[in-house]
Amino acid sequence: MELALVGNPSNGVAKPSCNSVGSLPVVSSNAVINPPVTSAAGATLGRHLARRLVQIGATDVFAVPGDFNLTLLDYLIAEPGLKLIGCCNELNAGYAADGYARARGVGACAVTFTVGGLSVLNAIAGAYSENLPVICIVGGPNSNDYGTNRILHHTIGLPDFSQELRCFQTITCYQAVINNLDDAHEQIDTAIATALRESKPVYISVGCNLAGLSHPTFSREPVPLFISPRLSNKANLEYAVEAAADFLNKAVKPVMVGGPKIRVAKAKKAFAGIAESSGYPFAVMPSAKGLVPEHHPRFIGTYWGAVSTTFCAEIVESADAYLFAGPIFNDYSSVGYSLLLKREKAVIVQPDRVVVGNGPAFGCILMTEFLDALAKRLDRNTTAYDNYRRIFIPDREPPNGQPDEPLRVNILFKHIKEMLSGDTAVIAETGDSWFNCQKLRLPEGCGYEFQMQYGSIGWSVGATLGYAQAAKDKRVISCIGDGSFQMTAQDVSTMLRCGQKSIIFLINNGGYTIEVEIHDGPYNVIKNWDYTGLIDAIHNSDGNCWTKKVRTEEELIEAIATATGAKKDCLCFIEIIVHKDDTSKELLEWGSRVSAANSRPPNPQ
C-alpha cells in the first residue's frame, strides 16, 4: 500500500492526502523575489528539488542567500507555485520553517554552507524536538573540492568539509550530501520521504556547481513522489485493543489525556472520536494544547500537575485508570517530576506502540488505528466527568482595572480570550505567556502553538512569520516577552514584506521573568527598548503596520478595537507595559518546583 501525493499536476501544486491542516498560500506576496530571466526550465537538479517541495506542500521556502546557494535559489525562484522568502538571519529562517510546518505539515529553509548551516542549527534542533518535518537545504562547496586539501572560506579552516554534516547528524533523521549527479535524484527523494514518514527534519546539502545541471534521472515533469506508509501489525493491534479495553472497562472512573505526539501520529480525529464515544472526561498536556477539541463539553482543561487548570489535576490523579495518547513526560511538563501518577494505572499510547499498565507492551501499532478500534470496545463511562461536574466552580474573572490604574497581565489575557475564534491562531512564547495562554479556552478551529520541549526563547517571532505564511485563513495572535523579542526582533520586517496581518502583543516587564522565578540574579535584567519605536523604524513607511504602546486597560481596549477594526488588514504591534513582578501564580508554583529539580544534589557515589 502506498501513499501518493495528490493535487493539480498541471500547476505542480500538491500535498499529502493525509495533510488537512492549513491551505495553500495565494501567490501574492511583496516578499517574493521575481524570477530572473533564465533558461532554467530543463530537467535539472535545482528544478527537481524545487518541484518536490511544491508537491509536498512546502510552497514557501525561508532563505538567507550566500555565495554557495545562489544558483540553487535561482531555481527555487523560477519554480511556478514556489515562493522564496528572504529572512534577516538563518535562525529566524529555521524558526519560520518550524512555524510553517506546524500549520502546513512540512516546512523548508535554505541557507549557505557552515556559516548559514550552523546558524540555523538551533532552530532545526527545536524542530527535531517537536517532531516537525523541516527540509533544511544547504548550498554546499563545489563538488570538485571534496577530497582535496583545499581550504575554503565559510569553513573553520580545515580541508575536511564534514564538520557541518556531523553537527546535523544528531538533529535530523536523514542527511544527504549531494556532490555528484548520479545519485542526486535518489538522495533528494529519500530525504524528503524520510522527513514526512518520520516527522523529523532532514538535511540536504547541494554542491554549488550542481543545481543547474541536468541528468537522465531528472525528468521535466518529475514522477509523483510516493511514500509507503507504516502499517499496524494486525495481530498485535487486536491483542493491544483487547488488553486495553479489558483494563479500562474494569475501571470505575477512567479519564483520557492528550499528549503532543498526537500531531506526529495524525491522530487528532481519532482522539476526538474515542473521547466522544467513551464518555470519559479528557484533558490535554500543556505541550499538546490545540490538538484536542477544547470546545467539547467533556474537556476539563490542561493537566500540568500542580499548575493544572482548576479541578483538572484532582480528576486525573484520582482516577483509577487513565489513557495517555502521545505523552511526553519531561521535567517541564511534569513540573519538576512532581506528577502524582501511577504507572500501573496507565495505558500509554505512542504513535507506534502501546503499553498497558505494568503489563504487556505492543509494538508496530499505529495510534490512529488503535484508538479507532478501542473506541468500539469501550463501555461508556461518565463517572469521572460526573465527579468533575460536582466539584467544578468556574474561575472568577479578574476585576476590571480602575481608570489610570497600571495594566495587569491577567487583564490583558482576559481581553485576548475575547479575541479568539476559529479564524485565529495563538503563538505563545517561552515564558509567562506559556501559563497565561494555557488558560485560554480555544474555540473550535482556533490554532495554538508553542515550543515546550525545546523552549528556545525568541522562537515565536520566526514561528509567527512561518505560521501566518502557511495559514493565510487565520489571523495569528502572538504573545511575546520583551527578553525573547530581543533575540529575534528583526524578522518583523519580513512579516511586513509578506503583507502579513498578525497581532503581536509585546509584554514589556523589563527582564527574563521565567528565569527570575527559577533562579534570580542581575543577569535576568535586560536593557529596556522603545519597542514600538523599533517597529516604527523597521516599518519605515513601507508596508502596512500599526503600533501602539499601552499602559492601562482603557488603552488596551481601544488598541484591540483598532487592531480588529480599522487596522484589521495591518500588522499590529501592541506593546504592553506591566510591572516587572506581575506574573501568573502558575509560573510562581512551576518555577519553584523546577528550581528544586534543577538544584538536586549529586547522588551518593
From Swiss-Prot:
One Gene Ontology term, aspect cellular component: cytosol
SUBUNIT field: Homotetramer.
E.C. numbers: 4.1.1.1
UniProt-recorded name of the protein: Pyruvate decarboxylase 1
Keywords, in A-Z order: Decarboxylase, Lyase, Magnesium, Metal-binding, Thiamine pyrophosphate
Cross-referenced Pfam families: TPP_enzyme_C, TPP_enzyme_M, TPP_enzyme_N
Cofactor dependency: a metal cation; thiamine diphosphate
Record-linked InterPro entries: DHS-like_NAD/FAD-binding_dom (IPR029035), PDC/IPDC-like (IPR012110), THDP-binding (IPR029061), Thiamin_PyroP_enz_cen_dom (IPR012000), Thiamin_PyroP_enz_TPP-bd_dom (IPR012001), TPP_enzyme_TPP-bd (IPR011766), TPP_PDC_IPDC (IPR047214), TPP_PYR_PDC_IPDC-like (IPR047213)
UniProt similarity note: Belongs to the TPP enzyme family.
Binding site for Mg(2+): 482, 509, 511
Organism in which the protein naturally occurs: Oryza sativa subsp. japonica (Rice)
Disulphides: none
Binding-site residues, substrate: 67, 154, 515
GO molecular function: magnesium ion binding; pyruvate decarboxylase activity; thiamine pyrophosphate binding
GO biological process assignments: aromatic amino acid family catabolic process to alcohol via Ehrlich pathway
Taxonomic path: Eukaryota, Viridiplantae, Streptophyta, Embryophyta, Tracheophyta
Catalytic activity: a 2-oxocarboxylate + H(+) = an aldehyde + CO2
Bound cofactor: record note: Binds 1 metal ion per subunit.
Region (Thiamine pyrophosphate binding): 432-514
